[in-house]
Amino acid sequence: MRALVQRVTSASVRVDGDEVGRITPPAGGHGLLVLVGVTHTDDEAKAALLAKKVWTMRILENEQSASDLDAPVLVASQFTLMADTRRGRRPSWSAAAPRPVAEPLVDEFTGALRELGATVETGVFGEHMEISLVNDGPVTLLIDV
């Protein structure tokens, strides 16, 4: 599994013009926008490990984690994170898991974050989403497990 994690001062996601998720940390605070990609060999253990890593990664103020600050998290699935761009000019999507594999694992990741104590908002799996964010820093990390 792969997560693109961004430290944000706000983030929201819209589907068909309707807002389906939003995080607004307290004034001066941060939250995390997490885009999640799943490959064929991923499983529930990897989803739980990725959730723990994201929740405890020390990328917020004063080298603290989202866990330390109860920072909100917005999660959206993004199969394009699994693109292979090493050859030619057209990305290959063959490493991205199909929906029957990926959707339950994104749900497992989100559930694991909630079990760890996170306040989590989500996008809608498989839908075209418009994501708005204010990336602070910028701080953007790619995490693979």
UniProtKB/Swiss-Prot annotation:
Its EC number is 3.1.1.96. GO terms for cellular component: cytoplasm. Keywords: Cytoplasm, Hydrolase, RNA-binding, tRNA-binding. GO terms for molecular function: D-tyrosyl-tRNA(Tyr) deacylase activity; Gly-tRNA(Ala) deacylase activity; Ser(Gly)-tRNA(Ala) hydrolase activity; tRNA binding. GO terms for biological process: D-amino acid catabolic process. A motif (Gly-cisPro motif, important for rejection of L-amino acids) lies at residues 137-138. An aminoacyl-tRNA editing enzyme that deacylates mischarged D-aminoacyl-tRNAs. Also deacylates mischarged glycyl-tRNA(Ala), protecting cells against glycine mischarging by AlaRS. Acts via tRNA-based rather than protein-based catalysis; rejects L-amino acids rather than detecting D-amino acids in the active site. By recycling D-aminoacyl-tRNA to D-amino acids and free tRNA molecules, this enzyme counteracts the toxicity associated with the formation of D-aminoacyl-tRNA entities in vivo and helps enforce protein L-homochirality. Belongs to the DTD family. PANTHER family: D-AMINOACYL-TRNA DEACYLASE 1 (PTHR10472:SF5), D-TYROSYL-TRNA TYR DEACYLASE (PTHR10472). A Gly-cisPro motif from one monomer fits into the active site of the other monomer to allow specific chiral rejection of L-amino acids. Homodimer. This is D-aminoacyl-tRNA deacylase. It comes from Rhodococcus jostii (strain RHA1). The gene is dtd.
